[in-house]
Amino acid sequence: MAANVSGAKSCPANFLAAADDKLSGFQGDFLWPILVVEFLVAVASNGLALYRFSIRKQRPWHPAVVFSVQLAVSDLLCALTLPPLAAYLYPPKHWRYGEAACRLERFLFTCNLLGSVIFITCISLNRYLGIVHPFFARSHLRPKHAWAVSAAGWVLAALLAMPTLSFSHLKRPQQGAGNCSVARPEACIKCLGTADHGLAAYRAYSLVLAGLGCGLPLLLTLAAYGALGRAVLRSPGMTVAEKLRVAALVASGVALYASSYVPYHIMRVLNVDARRRWSTRCPSFADIAQATAALELGPYVGYQVMRGLMPLAFCVHPLLYMAAVPSLGCCCRHCPGYRDSWNPEDAKSTGQALPLNATAAPKPSEPQSRELSQ
């Protein structure tokens, strides 16, 4: 916290230091070790997923693999931003890498977080097309289309994350503050997401990210999986066990999304609102005790909890979206549209049972189905 957003009076430096010291305690106590563990697991799981994709003999990759690779790359890059953040949060909270690295770390995390959401949405929509509209998918969707959509997704993520380069900055200690230590946190350099005088604009930006980077993709994912679920439930050729397996796979993906990205963005906006209210009142506080007592710890602690829990999604994505296990593809071959268009040769050529096998392009010399060849 740096200055009063009202512009009438500045917040006393000792009030700001006391507030920062109290709030930083939550990060130093639990957040940094969680980030270290998540980094190790996310790098191992997504690195393994990328390795498995790289040794696939079948080329070109069909859209399922293209989107899954983009998701693994975005998760891996996002995980690589966690070690410098953990080192920063480790007491004493001190940024040692310069202002350019501060801005870059914030940008890369936000960009790859948005990329992760975008490619999850692409996977969901591709599953929908492959199962509910298999004729269209097999006739029109090609790997080049998936690569083009992926490129557009990366550009969109970068554009949405670009403002973080402007908002992020270093807060340097006052001259003569001494050496940074646990006993002298006011002498440490802070890497901040935004200064208090920019909180109004930062709140608007956070709302845009919550809407375009979380809400809209969630609605598209829910719509795609809802239509897919209806197709599965109406399929007379599927057993109850197969339907339950599809339902579990879909529900787990939606639950992971709703329990990680959604609360993260909500708590981020609530935390910014709490910061604005405190900064506006700061010049009127009588003493340090009143200033620290006025801190709204609920939104802040909730946001820190989600900063620790949200990266767990990067660790779980390889299991949900990239693992070569029987999933929607093998179950939904009994779906009416899928059954008419599915070709056993597609399963052999893909070498995996990802739910999007139906989107693999048929060979020009082969009929799309027995019905079409008659």
UniProtKB/Swiss-Prot annotation:
It is a multi-pass membrane protein. Residues 1-29, 86-116, 168-206, 267-308 are extracellular. Its main location: membrane. Disulfide bonds join 102-180. GO terms for biological process: activation of adenylate cyclase activity; calcium-mediated signaling; cellular response to ATP; defense response; G protein-coupled receptor signaling pathway; neuronal signal transduction; phospholipase C-activating G protein-coupled receptor signaling pathway. GO terms for cellular component: plasma membrane. CDD domains: 7tmA_P2Y11. It holds the Pfam family 7tm_1. Residues 345-374 are annotated as: Disordered. The keyword Cell membrane applies. It comes from the Eukaryota. Keywords: Cell membrane, Disulfide bond, G-protein coupled receptor, Glycoprotein, Membrane, Receptor, Transducer, Transmembrane, Transmembrane helix. Residues 51-64, 138-146, 228-245, 330-374 are cytoplasmic. One of its GO terms (molecular function) is neurotransmitter receptor activity. The chain crosses the membrane at residues 30-50, 65-85, 117-137, 147-167, 207-227, 246-266, 309-329. Belongs to the G-protein coupled receptor 1 family. This is P2Y purinoceptor 11. The gene is P2RY11.
